Structures are given as structure tokens and as C-alpha cells.
Amino acid sequence: SIIADGNDITYLPDYKRASILGRVFQDPMMGTNPNMMIEENMALAMRRGQRRGLKWGISQKEREFYHEQLKLLKLGLEDRLTTKVGLLSGGQRQALTLLMATLKKPKVLLLDEHTAALDPKTAEKVLDMSDRVVEENHLTTLMVTHNMKDAIAHGNRLIMMDAGHIVVDISGEDKKKLTVPDLMALFSKASGSTEANDKMLLG
């Protein structure tokens, strides 16, 4: 079963889960509509899980709110509200998707290898933004990654899986003291495997 905030959401339809879960996908192109403006994408995110009727799409008050939220990303997007999202870089789109996923303060935020398609410098920026957004909004977050270095550096609990089973579960001070070689050794011992590919080591 999948339990969120005390409720079983295992079989909830996607439109109902949308008000509970925020998601950022691996592909920067998946979380936004490239043919719509930044403010229009944000408006859709704000209305996630709500009944929609016929009214003006974006009020001035909303526009001011989006401006302030975008300013927190420190990417200059607050002055590009009417820019079509398709004109943004992959890193900008992923940062926007992260912001959109957290506008409604979801019960759980899912980050599905959300930096895997980005260059190392941009990936680091998006990870830093993720940490800041999660901390400021006190969000329960699950980040999926094959990068051991990132798994150690981010979050307060680290879980490794092998063949669908949890084989490593470490948190607190033990996690803070971890190194990549330590983690490789733990995984090898728990899974019985001596293989660790480059993706796990470097991302």
C-alpha cells in the first residue's frame, strides 16, 4: 500500500493524487507545456486538483505571486512571465518544474532522477534549489538517483534497492559520515554483488 498523510492513495486516479503529490521528472521537457507562457504553466500548477470553471485565466494578484515565487529561483525568470517555456534551457525548465510542483505544498514531493539529463554545473544548481525549496517548505521528499555522491550529500535518509528489495537503509550521523567507497561496500555486502557501474559512482 501507498500511504500519504494517513490515507491510502494506492489506487487513487491521477487527478486526485495531483493534490497530494508533487513530481519532477527526469526529462525537463515533461513537467511543463512548451507552447504556453511561464505564467500559464504556473497557473495550471496552482489549479491542480481543483474544480475549474469559466473565468479570467490569470489575475493580477496571481501574476504578482508568480513573480515573487520565480524571484526565489534567482534565474531572472520573474521578468519573463510571458515567455514561452519552450524557449528556456533545460536547467531553467527543470527549476520551473520544481517550483510548479511545490506551489501547492504537496504532502510528498517525488524527484525522479530530476538532474540526470542536465550538465554537471546545471545539475548542481538544481540540486541546491531542491534542497532550499524542500527545507523552506518543510516537504517530505523522495529523491530517486543512481548517483551515490548526490545520494550521500542530499537528504537525511538513504535507501538503496536491489532487485526490488531494500538492501541498505541508513540515516542520521551514520549517513553524514558516509563516503562513496563506504556506500559501495555496504551495497556489495548487502546485495551480494561486487558490481558498481559508472552511473552509480558519478551519476
Protein language model features and the residues they cover:
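Conserved beta-strand-loop-alpha-helix hinge in the C-terminal portion
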Residues: 165-191
